[in-house]
Amino acid sequence: MSDKKKAFWFIALLSTLVIIPFLGETIFYSKGEPREAIVAYSMLESGNWILPLNYGTDIAYKPPFLYWSIAAISAIFGGVSEFSSRLPSAIAFLAMQFVFFGFVARYKNTKTAVITSLLLLTSFEVHRAAVACRLDMLCLLYTSDAA
């Protein structure tokens, strides 16, 4: 296996081990997290996946992809929980990390890609967004990968 592939799998394994196992360890810690999860819960309960509503009354103000992601993952896991609500953000972070590593490795070198990927993984605000049930990481994934 080439050095680039070894480095990629190292970053992939480390990023996954740092992010995924701890998603459901804490309860929702802000007003925003349960607000997003409630919309996904309402989607599952009502079966209305077109117009996301908050407990059947208020129309959600954010783009629906986060709600769709939470609802789809929660349907697989058997219900909306802290883990299933935060998993879309974590998956978006991992996808962004992999694309970021590939981009830097392609245009610089593997050593620089490993260092910058580790810096991204340990960045406080990026890590916070990766383990929270918020739209931020999905938006960051799509805007950074579009460039």
What residue ranges belong to the model's regions?
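Active-site Asp-x-Gly
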Residues: 147
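Membrane-integral, polyisoprenol-dependent glycosyltransferases
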Residues: 2-144
